[in-house]
Amino acid sequence: MSSDKFKLDTLFDDNDEIIEPDGADVKKRNVAYYYHKDVGHFHYGQLHPMKPQRLVVCNDLVVSYEMPKYMTVVESPKLDAADISVFHTEDYVNFLQTVTPKLGLTMPDDVLRQFNIGEDCPIFAGLWDYCTLYAGGSVEGARRLNHKMNDIVINWPGGLHHAKKSEASGFCYVNDIVLGILELLKYHKRVLYIDIDIHHGDGVQEAFNNSDRVMTVSFHRFGQYFPGSGSIMDKGVGPGKYFAINVPLMAAIRDEPYLKLFESVISGVEENFNPEAIVLQCGSDSLCEDRLGQFALSFNAHARAVKYVKSLGKPLMVLGGGGYTLRNVARCWALETGVILGLRMDDEIPGTSLYSHYFTPRLLRPNLVPKMNDANSAAYLASIEKETLACLRMIRGAPSVQMQNIVGIRLDEIEQIEENERLQKSSKSSIEYEVGKVSEKMEEECFVEEDSKPPSFPPGQDPRRIGQYWGYDRSGLAPPRSHSDVIEEAKYEDRDRRKDLNIPGIP
């Protein structure tokens, strides 16, 4: 990576603007930011590491830094069953649409197994609404890019990359990324998908594994680690051979080697694939100190990867993904919103934030301290880079334009998007500053990330089915099917305290 593009000790450059005080005349960027005040108020269950409340805190930081005035803020629409069935099977969509926690208690085990419902992917109240909200921003965001209404769209609630065509996986139920890419393919011949989540983007690769119109590139922790896929030799099949790029990394990779490899691979992809649009999944579990992650990336490095992709100048959709240390998820995505907008952000979190007292230190980019040695040798990374670039050189000619199962173009898309925005503007509340606030009970649970009190369950209820339990299980280690299959890899800081809770699977 050339030293003139990114310096490891700084993130912002001379082209980035200082955020103007409230009331100042500012220039809006051609960026759309999707958010809905309800999307962060769902609850996977007590002890479950996935906290949608992180979205509320992230949006609070975005508002506190006064970023909405620099972009178009759009209320995420809810998708309907037909929208989601563009990718997912009818049986699975019907299940998601009708299942409730109470109904789940009476369902046969084979039905739950069919859709991979369990500890990782529980049934919780409002499951269908949650899915339609987080996916709505990705699908409509793709439509805005298709019609050149924006250069960049941001949907932090999206990026749930593990969901499969007919089953849930890895905390993900509906694959909003696949739905968004299918929309983009209506107007773009070639779409590039980049994934910097610590977990392999298996659901997206699987969906496009035999396509030469979508290239998937995943930088992920490899080995005995969920989902257990993403070998460097996994390169796609049929027409899609060499269009799946996997960059398997070992634990505790540091900033400089990660960024060097990232730029080398992505520049090679840009040269050989020449995408017309890009989707970037920004899972923040690749940060150092993540509760489930094992990388050692700083906030600067993670954001620098986003900045590099933005610099390619292609229509860009930016999505969230994993991330299980709530404060750092909010910090990361708020920071990257500013990077996308080209803003120079004060490192001190504004006192106007509703959650500023939970950030200790009260900094946007605190120093994260690695607890493991980097397991990625220079020789190993060089071999990964060499093999990846060789794979890219195997691409012959331009990808085909035709692709099976692409739905027809809707002629009324622009009118519908504009109508949605008109209705939003005429409503009494302003989405730009309607932050939302989680309940005090939920707030305490989310920020006190290791619950010191044992969960209480009503007699006779199976907590694994209703989202009140999340633990570990030593079964099924080859290959891992869920996060709970990889007990040695999914670490919590206070293991002994969880052991005292008598959670099954904790020795």
Curated annotation (Swiss-Prot):
It is found in: Nucleus. The keyword Hydrolase applies. Residues 482-501 have a biased composition (Basic and acidic residues). It comes from the Eukaryota. Residues 444-507 are annotated as: Disordered. GO terms for cellular component: histone deacetylase complex; NuRD complex. It is an enzyme of class 3 (hydrolase). GO terms for molecular function: histone deacetylase activity; histone deacetylase activity, hydrolytic mechanism; transcription corepressor activity. Keywords: Chromatin regulator, Hydrolase, Nucleus, Repressor, Transcription, Transcription regulation. The active site is at residue 162. Residues 29-342 are annotated as: Histone deacetylase. It catalyses: N(6)-acetyl-L-lysyl-[histone] + H2O = L-lysyl-[histone] + acetate. GO terms for biological process: chromatin organization; DNA protection; heterochromatin formation; negative regulation of transcription by RNA polymerase II; nematode male tail tip morphogenesis. InterPro entries: HDAC_PDAC, His_deacetylse, His_deacetylse_1, His_deacetylse_dom, His_deacetylse_dom_sf, Ureohydrolase_dom_sf. May be a component of a histone deacetylase complex containing saeg-2, saeg-1 and hda-2. Probably responsible for the deacetylation of lysine residues on the N-terminal part of the core histones (H2A, H2B, H3 and H4). Histone deacetylation gives a tag for epigenetic repression and plays an important role in transcriptional regulation, cell cycle progression and developmental events. Histone deacetylases act via the formation of large multiprotein complexes. As a likely component of a histone deacetylase complex, together with saeg-1 and hda-2, functions downstream of the cAMP-dependent kinase egl-4 to regulate the expression of genes required for egg-laying and forgaging. Belongs to the histone deacetylase family. HD type 1 subfamily. This is Putative histone deacetylase 2. It comes from Caenorhabditis elegans. The lineage of its organism: Eukaryota, Metazoa, Ecdysozoa, Nematoda, Chromadorea. The gene is hda-2.
